[in-house]
């Protein structure tokens, strides 16, 4: 299973709220909902998040063996 828990940890570390992400970076609420519920996202979206947050993929997601 893919977990996006590191994404929220990265936001905390960088002191970025989800509101600020939506407002300043045009990240949709739908995307945040997908991340919150560990639903799939595209590699393009993953790339965009890494660019926006200036981070690596492992700062966005992690693999957890079922």
What role is predicted for each listed range?
Residues 54-66:
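Short C-terminal boundary/hinge segments that cap the last helix of small helical domains
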Residues 19, 47, 58:
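Residues within the helices of the helix-turn-helix
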Residues 12, 23, 37, 62-65:
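Residue-level detection of the helix-turn-helix DNA-binding "recognition helix"
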Residues 15-33:
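Short alpha-helical DNA-recognition segment
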Residues 1-20:
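A short, Lys/Arg-rich alpha-helix, primarily the initiator
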Residues 39-51:
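Short, basic-rich loop-to-helix N-cap that marks the start of a DNA-contacting helix
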